[in-house]
Amino acid sequence: MRLIIAVDGPAAAGKGTLARRLASAFGLPHLDTGLLYRAVGRLVLDAGGDPGSPADAAWAVSVLVPETVQRSDLRVPEVDRAASLVAADPAVRAALLDFQRDFAAREGAVLDGRDIGTVVCPDAPVKLFVTASAEARLQRRLLELRNRGVAVEEQALRAEMQARDERDAARDVAPLRPAEDAEVLDTTHLDADQAFQRAEQIVRRKWPR
């Protein structure tokens, strides 16, 4: 069996940074699956469509190319909302599922998202669910956006993050939740180095090879 590390969790919990560092430490390719949904949402918005429309989302999936996933404007609040809406569409999730599984199956991988351990790679030998308090996550996302020069109002962002959490947890297909055998890592009071150290210990315990 290849080493597959599934890293799930809500927005701004630190899963992306952690996944990248784990991939580097264990010599594995990394896939931020959230970028796939962000790219689909971005395409819908650019076309003046409705991210909640199955037809608009299906069109965006059909024209998705790798370059779209590399765009620099995928991590802004309006795309956060669009990504959450298209991700609730079963047809979109099904269309992107094979891509994610193929990526993981090649040589092992680190994948981060919201349903890696529960749906995409349910047999992954290492599953992490990274979380943090709502306030900690809000402050991290504010800092991230402002460091990139994105103008954002704190209360509006708070409301949007809360709404996304609720949508992700309540959707019928692949709701956000820890896998039964996932290790929960609360990063509320951890910096990036501390979170990585704890995650690395979990991986080496689960995969002592």
From Swiss-Prot:
Q: What is its EC number?
A: 2.7.4.25
What does the entry give for GO biological process?
pyrimidine nucleotide metabolic process
Q: EC top class, in one word?
A: transferase
Could you name the Gene Ontology cellular component terms for this entry?
cytoplasm
Using the record, list the residue span of the signal peptide; answer none if the entry has no such feature.
none
Q: Which InterPro entries match?
A: Cytidylate_kin, Cytidylate_kinase_dom, P-loop_NTPase
- According to the lineage, what is the superkingdom? Bacteria
Provide the alphabetized UniProt keywords.
ATP-binding, Cytoplasm, Kinase, Nucleotide-binding, Transferase
In which compartments does the protein localize? Cytoplasm
Does the UniProt entry include the keyword Transcription?
Answer: no
Task: Indicate which residues the UniProt annotation says bind ATP.
Answer: 9-17
Which GO terms of the molecular function aspect are on file?
Answer: ATP binding; CMP kinase activity; dCMP kinase activity
Q: Which reaction does it catalyse?
A: CMP + ATP = CDP + ADP; dCMP + ATP = dCDP + ADP
Tell me which family the UniProt entry assigns to this protein.
Belongs to the cytidylate kinase family. Type 1 subfamily.
Q: Could you tell me what this protein is called?
A: Cytidylate kinase
What organism does the UniProt record list as the source? Granulibacter bethesdensis (strain ATCC BAA-1260 / CGDNIH1)
| Gene assigned in the entry | cmk
